[in-house]
Structures are given as C-alpha cells and as structure tokens.
Design a protein with these regions (language model features):
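N-terminal periplasmic accessory domains that precede
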Residues: 61-65, 80-85, 96-97, 112-117, ...
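Periplasmic-side early beta-strands and strand-to-turn transitions of outer-membrane beta-barrels
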Residues: 133, 145, 152-154, 162, ...
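Outer-membrane beta-barrel signature, preferentially recognizing the C-terminal barrel domain
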Residues: 246-262, 288-292, 385, 392-450, ...
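Surface-exposed extracellular loop regions of Gram-negative outer-membrane beta-barrel proteins
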Residues: 274, 362-364, 368, 377-428, ...
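Gram-negative outer-membrane beta-barrel transporters
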Residues: 345-352, 446-449, 468-551, 592-595
Length: 619
C-alpha cells in the first residue's frame, strides 16, 4: 500500500505538479485521532485527496475506492444491495465514518453508500487492519473516514452537472463563506440512474433504477483563538424502483453539535435512518425499518512540547432498531467506551504510539479491551520509513444478529442468536517506504487472525438459517506500490496486492477475496496559459479469478461452489479548465469493452463501453 495521497497536480489552474514528497509534507491526516502530517503518522494510511476524486470521474464512494485501491471490490448481495470486500473483510468489519462520526442504518452489514456524497470532500482516509482501539466495534478490518472540505476565505459558489450512460444524471450545488468569526458550507446534490438491462444471462437480468437527494450544512463560529462551536445538519432521501408494483424508499436525518475549548472537545450526534415500502397504485408508503442513534463524545488532548501528545476520551451511544425482521418490533442497547493514547516522539526519528480502549455493550453484555502499538523509524537521511503496527479488533453482535426472526417469503426463516460471542481480531503489519524527490516505493506485509466471525449458516435443529460464530479465519498478504512524477506534468503509480484467506472447515465463502489485484494510474496535466489547464487520467485495474460458495434461495442448506472469472477494466478521464471558473470533463468507462459472459453477483455492472460528460462552474 502506498502512503502517498495521490500525486500529480491539484485542480486549480495556478498549481504546478505535486511530487510524492510534497504530498507527504502537506497532507494532514487524523488516523491516530490527533492531526499529523502523513509522513509522520506511524499508522499505515492511504489518502485519496479531493484532486484524486475530481480526476477519477467517479461520482460515488464505491466506484472511487474500487478504482483507487486494488484490494477493494464491491459486489451485490441479497436484493441487489451492495457489499464491500476490502482485503478479506466485509461490511461488518469495515467501519465507514463521515467526518469521524458513525452512520445509522445498514443492509447486510453494509451502510447505505449513496449517503456518502463526494461533492464536498477534502480527502478520504483509509486505514487497513484492526482499529478498534481508536474507533471501537466494527473496526476489525479497517476504517474509511470521509472528511468534508472546509470553506475558504470569502464567498464561493460551485455548480456542477453530469450526464452519462444509462440515463445517468447528477446535479450539485455548493455555497460556502468564511471570515474571521464565521464559516458555513452548504451543499446539495441530486443523482439519478436509469434501469440497466444486461445483455447476457446471469444471477440477475437488470440493475434497478434509482434516484436520490442529499443536502448538508455545516456552520462554525469561532469564539476565540482556542474556542469554537460547530453545528451540522443533513437530509438524505433515495428511491429504488425494484418492481412495477412497489418501490423501496430510504431516508435519513442527521444533526450534530460540537464545542472546542483549548484541548477539550465535546460532541453530540443524532442520526435516524428509515426504510419504507411505497405502493405505486395507491401512493401510500409504510415504514418498516428505523435505526436511531444518539451519541456523545468527549476527548482531551494535551501536547507536551518535543515529547508527544496524550489523548483520552470516551463515548456514549444509544442505539435503537425497529425492523420488519424482528418478531417483537424493536430493540435498543447502550454502548459505553473509554480510550487512552500516547503519541510519543521517542527520539529524533522514532515515533511510538501505544493505545488502549475499553468497550461495553448492554444487549449482549459484551465487553472488550482493545490494545494497539504503532511504531515509525526513519533511519539515515530520512528517505526511508519503517513502520510496525499491531492492533486488536473487536465487533460486538448487533441487534439484528441477536434478535432477528425473519420469514423469507415462506421459504425459510433467518434467526438471530442471543448467545453470540463478539468477533475479535489481531492485525500485524510491517511496511517499508522509500521516498526521494519525485519517486517512491512501498512494500507492506500483513497478517490478520479473526476469531468468532459472525455469519449465518443452516441450522438443522431449527430448520433455518441462524447467526452463528464461525471458525478462525486467517487473512495474510503483501502490498507493493510505486510512484514516479516527471517534470513535464506526468505522474505514474502502480499497486499490486496479494491476499490469501484460510477459512475454517465448513465455513461459507460467500464473499471471497480475489487473491491477486493490480491497479495502474497515469495522470498528466499541462497549463497552456492562465486559467487554461488540461488534465488527463488513465486508470487500469485487473482482478484475478476466485472461487466462492453460493447459497441457493430455495435450498439454503446446500451451497454450491462457483468460480468467478478474472477481469480487467480501463477508464479514461479528460478535463479542461477555462476562464471565468468553467471546467468541462469527459469520462470513458470500460474502454476495453469488457462484458461478463455471465453476470454473477460480483461481476462489474457494465454492459460495455460507456461514459459521461460533466460541466462545472465556480466563483
């Protein structure tokens, strides 16, 4: 895995080429809960910057992560709901955060990825490996933290529109303001995608049409140099046309308030996520799912000059879930935690970061202490960085897994299990990075041990599927990446990852990891004259074949083995800036015109070559 946050050029006409060294020296990350330059963080962190996002041509987080990281693949689960696999871990082990906050709502252990609007994003931080000592439950395999952009001085407005294949339409607006005391950012976005009919046979014949609204506002008032108050609010709505008779609707309302005074920060967050069934003939809708979360976070950080930073804090979370999958309607639970961390500069070129966290969950009576230890050594002239990380992961069984009682259309039942144990994991990774001027090389080896994995299997005694603790899982691999920037505006980087999974006997490989994956990206930028900049990007990805298990809907007690073929994808994007703040963009997807011979649930949802055109204006 590369530690670089994407090189090449920034997206303003005045900027020149950014080298890997410039990126490490300027990008600030929060992977250790305390802001640090990317080059100084002991935790192996991948950063996707706003410039990377604009050059990617991808309007959503799923497409962005698949393009930028070889070990990430999104597939379709039951009822065409997307599910992630990131280096051997599914949605239950990857924690998605929005500005460091958890999100309510899930389907098949995955959040609603359409909520993760990329319109006003400064960067995406990805930590691969266990991170429960910092972020608690669900971070057994990694964390994806989406950080919103901060307003620049003055008043700014940006409008954008995109049209593409399969009736793709996107419209966005962003308005921001900042002075010495007040900062505010308001963004709104509408996305629509028509139905996609697939030209060949498969596990499904079409992808449902969908459209969504996403509105967010964030305001900060600076009371003094070391004191401020921030308020935020968000609204989200999405409809999926899953049949001619009824549609699926999803809605979310979120809000938060945080205060900072010197070294103390306090936050309150509210998030309610709903699911509805909408009847086309009558125009009526019925809510059959609600997840409401209220949380409070308090954190104290004190910096000891030239020595290190001490951080301590705690969280309270009230989690309420009403679901059609429950026999009794609703359940709730409380989660309490406390954490400590010492970010220590042990020597001139040595950083050591130990951490400890305790979590307690009321519903399952689960509790866990999660330790971590991260070390960074930069020997010699500082061109080489050696990192060693150990972290424990932890995932308490959620309310659905504990209490589910769902009749699957009269075919079979899916039952929860109040006796479930918590998932635990141990992650060890070692990395070496060489960086000099305009080139870099990184190699990382990782090893994960996961105990008591939670999933459902057929239980003969109750003649249904039931959530159970599975056998131990081993996930081992190597990640190699290289990057080179050239003075004429070209940056090339490539990454290869090998992942090996070892399942316990009899465990279902429902979402297997492809053992080999490669990404190659080339960025070119040229400033013709003031305000006239051409940017071109090529993204190539190859994924190897993999064998998994498929459970039949009508015979869930029997699973068949299925081999999924290898495939490769190539995408091209071009953008040209013009005076007066206009930018024209063109994206071509699947240039190689790959069409699956059979559409499996983890096949790319493509019908061949496609593309989009976009236009934006900013003031």
């Amino acid at each position: 895995m590369t530690l670089m946050a994407g090189s090449g050029v920034a997206d303003t006409a005045a900027d020149l080429v950014v080298s890997p060294l410039d990126t490490l020296e300027t990008v600030v990350v929060t992977a250790t809960r305390t802001p640090k330059l990317l080059k100084d963080t002991p935790v192996v962190t991948r950063v996707v910057t706003s410039a990377d996002i604009s050059r990617s041509g991808k309007p959503d987080i799923a497409g962005l992560l698949e393009q930028q990281m070889p070990g990430v693949e999104f597939s379709l689960g039951m009822a065409q709901n997307p599910q992630i696999n990131m280096s051997g871990f599914g949605g239950g082990g990857i924690l998605f955060l929005l500005d460091g906050e958890r999100m309510a709502g899930e389907t098949l252990d995955n959040p609603d990825y359409s909520r993760l609007n990329l319109q006003n994003v400064d960067r995406v931080e990805i930590v691969k490996g266990a991170a429960s000592s910092l972020y608690g439950s669900n971070a057994t395999g990694g964390v994806v933290n989406i950080i919103s952009g901060s307003p620049k001085e003055g008043t700014h407005v940006k409008l954008n529109a995109r049209y593409g294949s399969h009736q793709l339409q996107s419209y966005g607006a962003l308005a921001s303001y900042r002075n010495k005391r007040i900062a505010n950012s308001l963004d709104a976005r509408f996305d629509s995608q028509g139905e996609i009919r697939f030209p060949r046979l498969g596990d499904f014949s079409r992808a449902f049409a969908t459209h969504s609204w996403n509105v967010r506002d964030r305001a900060t008032v600076t009371l003094a140099e070391d004191a401020s108050i921030t308020a935020r609010a968000g609204y989200y709505w999405r409809q999926r046309n899953s049949s001619n008779v009824s549609y699926e609707r999803y809605g979310d309302l979120s809000a938060g308030l945080s205060a900072r005074w010197k070294e103390l920060t306090a936050k309150y967050s509210f998030d309610t996520y709903d699911k509805y069934d909408y009847e086309v003939a009558t125009g009526e809708q019925a809510r059959d799912y609600r997840n409401r979360q209220n949380s409070v976070n308090v954190q104290y950080s004190h910096e000891f000059r030239d020595v290190g930073t001490f951080t301590a804090g705690g969280d309270w979370l009230d989690d309420y879930l009403m679901s059609y999958e429950f026999d009794s309607g609703s359940y709730s639970q409380t989660n309490l935690d406390a954490f400590l961390q010492w970010d220590w500069k042990a020597a001139d070129k040595v950083w050591i970061v130990p951490g400890l966290r305790y979590d307690w969950f009321s519903a399952s009576r689960a509790n866990r202490v999660s330790p971590k230890l991260s070390m960074l050594w930069r020997p010699g002239k500082g061109n080489c960085s050696l990192r060693l990380n150990y972290a424990a992961g932890f995932r308490a069984p959620n309310l659905k897994e504990l209490y589910m009682d769902f009749d699957m259309a009269g075919i079979f039942h899916i039952f929860g299990n109040p006796d479930l144990k918590s998932e635990t994991s141990h992650n060890l990774n070692v990395s070496a990075e060489y960086l000099k001027g305009n080139r870099s090389f990184t190699v990382m080896a990782f090893h994960n041990i996961v105990d008591n994995r939670i999933s459902y299997l057929w239980n003969e005694s109750i003649e249904g599927l039931q959530y159970l603790n599975l056998h131990r899982l081993f996930v081992t691999g190597v990640d190699v990446s290289a990057m080179r920037s050239f003075p004429f505006g070209l940056t090339v980087n490539g990454e290869y990852i090998y992942t090996h999974e070892k399942y316990g006997k009899g465990d279902l490989r429902a979402n297997p990891t492809r053992p080999h994956a490669v990404t190659v990206k080339a960025d070119y930028s040229h400033l013709w004259m003031t305000d006239w900049r051409l940017t071109a990007t090529a993204n190539f990805k190859w994924l190897s074949a993999v064998t998994g298990d498929v459970m039949s809907l009508f015979s869930p007690e029997a699973a068949r083995t299925q081999r999924y073929p290898a495939y490769s994808m190539l995408g091209l994007t071009l953008s040209q800036t013009f005076p007066k703040g206009f930018t024209l963009g063109v994206a071509v997807d699947n240039v190689l015109n790959y069409i699956p011979s059979y559409y499996y649930y983890n096949s790319p949802l493509t019908t061949g070559i496609g593309g989009s055109i976009s236009l934006s204006w900013q003031m």
